[in-house]
Amino acid sequence: MKQVNGEKLLASLGDGVKDIRGRITPDAPMDRVTWFRAGGLAELMFQPHDIDDLVAFLKILPEEVPLTVIGVGSNILVRDGGIPGVVLRLSAKGFGFVELAGENRILAGSICPDKHVAAMAMDNGIGGFHFFYGIPGSIGGAARMNAGANGVETRERLIEVNAVDRKGNKHVLSNAEMGYSYRHSTASSELIFTSVLFEGYPEERAQIRAEMDAVRNHRETVQPVREKTGGSTFKNPAGHSAWKLIDEAGCRGLVIGGAQMSSLHCNFMINMGQATGYDLEYLGEQVRREVFEKEGIKLEWEIKRLGVFMPGREVRPFHGVTSE
């Protein structure tokens, strides 16, 4: 049963949409755009042509209409009831660029894949970005959550973030204003990141290539990179590795419906073929329960769960612990 009505929402926006150049899609299937390949419909999906188009759309969008921003579809799990309101999916054409921006500096659009920034840095002898080669997803998401790999975090290279607020006003946030900590920033969720400025340091291209090769080889060896997965499921608790806790709790390879904790890397959930959003989220909460009961540690989700449940298919967070 469909839980959203995109045509009705589109009609409510009035004649202002006639001037919008980007793509507006009512009742857009989210299982086509997320890496899990699961979940319900976006009531209305908007893909702006460029930043001016984004600002124009925001100015006609009523404040009471929910707005959800996604990147390339990694690191998110969409519930089967879909996402009410507008899902903003920035276009590669307008927000997927990566370019040099001064000595050892790189400017990347928020939808630019992390690995493209790593490649740009290598091609120009700029060190400090090899870790991006092993992170699935896009730069906007990396900046939002302080993504990291191989002992390096996004905040170590980030200079500033360009953003737009819900009313279409533009902002620039410094590294300090992002309020970074492990896999987290305090930047307002109302801000839509449009581009990010980074700075590295001079390094020989051969050395950078060797570092990137090591990252790629490690990732392909220990992670299910060819499966339908959103990336790391849970954050590492202080002093612990999430995968090790999951393994010790006996959850490696655990299956619920069409979802499984990967046997290769058990902090990765995978869609084995026909998993629903319910299967995936229920599996995650079951793992949290098992780890707490056996290890006494509460895992915190790294995957973002979006949207609403189908009636009768709700997933209750373990022990009343917040699922955020």
Curated annotation (Swiss-Prot):
EC number: 1.3.1.98
Record's keyword annotation contains Oxidoreductase: yes
GO molecular function terms listed in the Swiss-Prot or TrEMBL record: FAD binding; UDP-N-acetylmuramate dehydrogenase activity
Gene3D superfamilies, per database record: 3.30.465.10, UDP-N-acetylenolpyruvoylglucosamine reductase, C-terminal domain, Uridine Diphospho-n-acetylenolpyruvylglucosamine Reductase, domain 2
Keywords: Cell cycle, Cell division, Cell shape, Cell wall biogenesis/degradation, Cytoplasm, FAD, Flavoprotein, NADP, Oxidoreductase, Peptidoglycan synthesis
Coiled-coil annotated residue ranges, if any: none
Compartment(s): Cytoplasm
Highest taxon above the source species: Bacteria
A matching Pfam family: MurB_C
An annotated GO cellular component: cytosol
Keyword Flavoprotein in record: yes
Active site: R183, S232 (proton donor), E302
Record field: catalytic activity: UDP-N-acetyl-alpha-D-muramate + NADP(+) = UDP-N-acetyl-3-O-(1-carboxyvinyl)-alpha-D-glucosamine + NADPH + H(+)
Gene Ontology terms: biological process: cell division; cell wall organization; peptidoglycan biosynthetic process; regulation of cell shape
FAD-binding PCMH-type domain span: 36-203
Cofactor(s) the protein needs: FAD
UniProt pathway annotation: Cell wall biogenesis; peptidoglycan biosynthesis
HAMAP family: MurB (MF_00037)
PANTHER family (alphabetical): UDP-N-ACETYLENOLPYRUVOYLGLUCOSAMINE REDUCTASE (PTHR21071:SF4)
Family per similarity comment: Belongs to the MurB family.
The protein's role, per its UniProt record: Cell wall formation.
Protein name (record): UDP-N-acetylenolpyruvoylglucosamine reductase
Source organism of the structure: Rhizobium leguminosarum bv. trifolii (strain WSM2304)
Lineage: Bacteria, Pseudomonadati, Pseudomonadota, Alphaproteobacteria, Hyphomicrobiales
